[in-house]
Curated annotation (Swiss-Prot):
Entry similarity comment: Belongs to the ZC3H14 family.
Cellular location(s): Nucleus speckle
Protein name: Zinc finger CCCH domain-containing protein 14
GO biological process, one term: regulation of mRNA stability
Main subcellular location of this protein, as a coarse class: nucleus
Taxonomic classification: Eukaryota, Metazoa, Chordata, Craniata, Vertebrata
Species: Danio rerio (Zebrafish)
Keyword RNA-binding in record: yes
The UniProt record lists the keyword Zinc: yes
Length: 669
């Protein structure tokens, strides 16, 4: 049991060294938690789920390494002992990842030997050989260990290994020195955690570079004696890619003073690599809790706090690793066109213009703000007067979408100058910059063109444009406005008074409307609004059942009245009042509620009975309620009335006294 506890401590120290290598070691809580998971026989997936909060991206590497170590110990324990004196050697080679300069793979060999006397000998040795290639060296290491089989105990969480009386000397080359014991009861067990530089093939790694090794220090070891040592190395500068080999060695001697600590570090590096930073930490004695288990702090709370801290750190670091892309809002139903598309359109038009014009064509490109203009002057065939070809393209940043229309370029004839309406739009250079930008889709009117005039078609298909949503009325209006705006410009450009004016063809994908054009459009809009009939500020008496809808000249309320029921306008109010529950049957003249059905009479009064002097002949026996004849009103005092001029009716038969009107039960004999 003592040896098993020592092996558990050795595994714990190796786990601690591995955590320090990954930079995830904080205190003893995490190694304790991992040892508990090992004791509970957690599978790699469960360990990866539980340790992902602590190790992050190194979780898979750690779990593969840990289960590789446990699998080796388990395979040694399960292997049956040999009956003969022969020694069975089983070697398992685990290739490690190659470095950037093509280092040799490291091989790990484990040999197990057993004797007839059921004695177990544990000896682990490793030697790091350096093979140089192009000024860089890697150290292939071979680990050989002879281990006695262990008895499986399902209830125990540690592995027991009985010590042998002596150790074997195992060497693979004359350079390797083995650790030999002069005492028969000494047991040497050493485990090393070798840290390697990550390579491109890190995804293929199936086992980590954990090895149990026996590293000798040569003849100096015999002078210093045998001491148990524990070493954990940590690379403080992660930018250095030098491999660091750290050995953790614990030696148990039966007749010596006890356990001692020694730092064993063998680092042989080339000039290409810098000196690796190393930190040697002596193993601390096992802490014993001073409080009973009932009063100790709950480890789950500590682990939860650590996980929350790690999660917050991951969140803060991930915010800066992922670049944030700024998104620019784009208007709906438009698509931002790249500069290449607009330049391609310009080049396409230029090529066709070169085909139509002579070689001495003058190219003059002007860029104003977001609009680019290409002006070409072409000499006339007969009159030798220059013809100006002007191409204006509004860039994508202004249009936010290219036009999908197809337009035709025609060479103007000498006899017939092209009409002014063939322009899509014009820009007055002397005016101020526009305050608003509007999309114009002017229709090219059908013109009779001779068959001899060449033409070519430039189409921009596949690009959505909001220009198609314009109505014909708007396009005609803007076409007329463009015509009026082009007239002054043509008068300024023409220097001759001949009947044949200078033809100019303006081809544009889109254009701006200047302030003058905007003012004219606004005036036309105002006139159109004034042409409509204004609604009268009076509530529609047929509302809410009015059939005219929005065309009704009267006001239809659409907002709740805020002063109801204290509104003094009643049914004349321009706001909505709740419906009256009596609706058309309501007889209240000033009812503030809304009546959906039309009331028959806003102030109904009952018809007064006709005043007739004819006394009903059936009086006072008449039973008809609405009898049109006169029924005298009886006097309340009846025969007791003492007024001589009483106008009420006094019946001739006296009314019996009150006592006579009382009913009494007849007594039965």
């Amino acid at each position: 049991m003592e040896i098993g506890t020592e092996i558990s401590k050795k595994i714990r120290t190796a786990i601690k060294g591995k955590l320090q290598e990954f930079g995830a070691y904080v205190d003893e809580e995490l190694p304790d938690y991992i040892m508990v998971m090992v004791a509970n026989k957690k599978n790699p997936q469960q360990m990866a789920d539980d340790l992902s909060l602590f190790l992050g991206n190194n979780t898979i590497k750690f779990t593969v390494w840990l289960h590789g170590v446990l699998e080796k110990l388990r395979s040694v324990a399960v292997e049956p002992p040999s009956l003969g004196p022969s020694v069975v050697h089983s070697e398992t080679s685990i290739p490690a990842e190659n470095s950037r300069r093509g280092a040799e793979p490291r091989a790990l060999a484990v040999s197990s030997s057993r004797s007839d006397k059921a004695e177990g000998r544990v000896s682990s040795s490793a030697h790091e050989n350096r093979a140089s290639k192009r000024g860089s060296s890697e150290r292939p290491s071979r680990l050989t260990s002879a281990v006695k089989p262990l008895m499986e105990a399902s209830a125990e969480a540690v592995i027991d290994i009985k010590p042998d009386l002596d150790d074997d000397l195992i060497s693979y080359d004359p350079v390797e020195h083995s650790l030999t014991s002069g005492h028969s009861q000494a047991l040497y067990s050493r485990s090393t955690a070798e840290r390697q530089r990550p390579a491109v093939e890190s995804s293929r790694r199936t086992a980590d570079t954990y090895r149990s090794s026996d590293i000798s220090r040569g003849q100096d070891r015999s002078e210093r004696g045998y001491r148990s040592s524990a070493e954990s190395s940590r690379d403080l500068s992660r930018k250095r890619k030098a491999p660091v080999a750290s050995s953790v060695v614990r030696v148990h001697r039966g007749h010596e003073r006890g356990l001692e600590i020694e730092d064993l570090e063998e680092e042989e590096e080339d000039e290409d690599y810098g000196l690796a930073s190393k930190v040697s930490l002596p193993s601390k004695p096992e802490r014993k809790p001073t409080l009973p288990p009932a009063k100790q702090a709950n480890k789950n709370l500590i682990l939860k706090a650590i996980s929350e801290a790690q999660e917050s750190i991951n969140k803060t670091t991930s915010q800066y690793t992922v670049p944030q892309r700024q998104t620019v809002p784009v208007a709906p139903r438009t698509r931002s066109a790249s500069d290449e598309m607009s330049n391609a359109a310009i080049r396409l038009v230029q090529e066709h213009l070169h085909a139509l014009t002579p070689q001495d064509t003058l190219h003059n490109t002007q860029s104003r703000g977001l609009a680019s203009r290409l002006q070409l002057e072409v000499p006339e065939e007969d009159s030798r007067e220059p013809h100006e070809y002007e191409l204006q393209v509004l860039e994508a940043a202004r249009l936010k979408a290219l036009d999908t229309r197809s337009f035709i370029m025609r060479q103007p004839e000498v006899e017939q100058p092209p009409p002014i309406r063939s322009r899509l739009s014009a820009v007055n250079q002397n005016e101020n910059a526009p305050t608003t930008s509007r999309m114009v889709q002017a229709r090219e009117r059908a013109e009779a063109v001779g068959g001899s005039s060449p033409k070519f078609i430039v189409t921009l298909d596949g690009v959505p444009s909001p220009l198609a949503n314009r109505t014909d009325q708007e396009m005609e209006t803007e076409d007329e406005l463009n015509t009026t705006a082009d007239l002054p410009e043509n008068n300024n450009n023409n220097n001759t008074t001949t009947t044949t004016s200078k033809p100019a063809v303006h081809l544009r994908l889109g254009a701006d409307l200047r302030n003058a054009c905007d003012d004219e459009v606004e005036e036309m809009d105002i006139e159109a609004v004034q042409a409509k009939r204004q609604k009268l500020p009076e509530r529609c008496k047929f509302w809410p059942t009015c059939k005219s809808g929005d065309e009704c000249l009267y006001h239809h309320p659409n907002t709740q009245c805020k002063v109801f029921p204290n509104c003094k306008f009643a049914d004349k109010c321009l706001f909505i009042h709740p419906n009256c529950k009596f609706d058309a049957k309501c007889t209240k003249a000033d009812c503030p509620f809304t009546h959906v059905s039309r009331r028959l009479n806003s102030n109904p009064t009952r018809a007064a009975p006709a005043l007739t002097s004819t006394v009903c002949r059936f009086f006072p026996e008449c039973k008809k309620v609405d009898c049109p004849f006169y029924h005298p009103k009886p006097c309340r005092f009846a025969t007791q009335c003492k007024r001589a001029d009483c106008t009420f009716y006094h019946p001739a038969v006296a009314v019996p006294p009150r006592s006579a009107l009382k009913w009494t039960k007849t007594q039965s004999s």
